[in-house]
A protein has these predicted regions:
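Conserved long alpha-helical elements within nucleotide-processing catalytic cores of c-di-GMP signaling
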Residues: 1-22, 32-36, 40-41, 48-56, ...
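Short catalytic/binding micro-motifs of nucleotide second-messenger systems
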Residues: 23-28, 60-71, 102-104
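Conserved ABC ATPase nucleotide-binding domain signature region
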Residues: 28-31, 113
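A short pre-motif secondary-structure segment
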Residues: 30-33, 74
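Short hydrophobic/aromatic beta-strand micro-patches
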Residues: 42-44, 83-84
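Catalytic-core segments of nucleotide cyclases and related cyclic-nucleotide turnover enzymes
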Residues: 52-55, 70, 85-116, 120-121
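PAS and PAS-like sensory/regulatory domains
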Residues: 76-78
Length: 121
């Protein structure tokens, strides 16, 4: 985005994604920007299927909100990786699994939700 439309457009995308995550998450969830254009959403008391459903809602919500730059509508899409844990889990390990799943989504064609398997960590 930054390379084609400038840093302001990239910043607008970051804000769009952040607002979507805040709007669709619960008060008990944690939304964090982990750097660049990546975010982490921690969903306590949510199973892997529930996380996948929310990730798909987030993906669809963002896809329905194109960015307008210089009177040009620019589609915005996201690739989301989902990972789960039963009980307590190390945040680094969980984040790493979600990141691997996100890269799987990108390799699969972008604008997708992916998880590595159906078993939580």
């Amino acid at each position: 985005m930054n390379g084609n439309f400038g840093n302001d457009a990239g910043d607008q995308v970051i804000r769009l994604v952040a607002r979507c995550l805040q709007r669709l998450s619960r008060a008990s969830d944690v939304v964090a920007r982990t750097g660049g254009d990546e975010f982490l959403l921690i969903l306590p008391h949510t199973d892997l299927d529930g996380a996948r459903v929310l990730a798909e809602r987030i993906r669809m919500d963002i896809a329905q909100r194109p960015l307008v730059v210089n009177q040009q509508r620019i589609p915005v899409t996201v690739s989301l990786g989902v990972a789960g844990a039963v009980g307590e889990a190390e945040l680094d390990k969980l984040s790493h699994e979600a990141s691997r799943a996100m890269h799987l989504a990108k390799r699969g064609g972008r604008n997708r939700v992916a998880s590595l398997d159906t078993k939580p960590i």
